[in-house]
């Protein structure tokens, strides 16, 4: 709940990370590929800003580029393990080159009328994947989410609500 973030009295902070991962072996789900190489970058930061009248502001950005080698049972999906109850399968092993980036932000008002806090979360995800053995090589994924939220304080307790739109 974005509105509840200001209740933690978070200090201002920022982080940056860069990583390279290599995965290899047979202890895996078949759709993940026998070998995976990935490059990841992430930054995030936020806090309470007096210049914005005590609002809490937070944001993050992440970028990932990964190569999947010898993936099985993946017909043409960037994320074959996306929580669906069925699998679109292909018996041919394939290689993939995928990249995605995610943007996320949260903004929260200070306590209004000594009782109410209003917040909003925004998320944007974009991904492009190219199966290296297929006449339809390019697959795209985009998702935009807006989550308004509100907190009502009662002395030492608080009640929060989220409203998801995507």
Task: Describe the role of every protein-language-model region.
Residues 25-27, 66-72, 129-133:
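Outer-membrane beta-barrel proteins
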Residues 35-43, 97-103, 135-146:
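Residues that define the transmembrane beta-barrel architecture of outer-membrane proteins
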């Amino acid at each position: 709940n974005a509105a509840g973030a200001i209740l933690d009295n978070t200090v201002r902070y920022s982080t940056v990370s860069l990583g390279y991962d290599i995965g290899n072996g047979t202890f895996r789900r078949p759709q993940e590929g026998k070998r995976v190489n990935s490059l990841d970058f992430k930054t995030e930061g936020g806090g309470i800003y007096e210049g914005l009248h005590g609002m809490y502001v937070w944001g993050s950005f992440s970028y990932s580029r990964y190569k999947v080698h010898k993936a099985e049972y993946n017909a043409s999906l960037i994320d074959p393990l996306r929580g669906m109850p069925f699998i679109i399968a292909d018996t041919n092993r394939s290689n993939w080159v995928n990249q995605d980036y995610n943007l996320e932000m949260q903004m929260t008002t200070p306590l209004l009328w000594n009782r109410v806090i209003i917040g909003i979360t925004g998320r944007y995800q974009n991904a492009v994947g190219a199966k290296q053995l297929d006449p339809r090589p390019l697959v795209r994924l985009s998702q935009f989410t807006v989550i308004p939220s509100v907190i009502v304080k009662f002395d030492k307790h608080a009640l929060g609500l989220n409203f998801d739109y995507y």
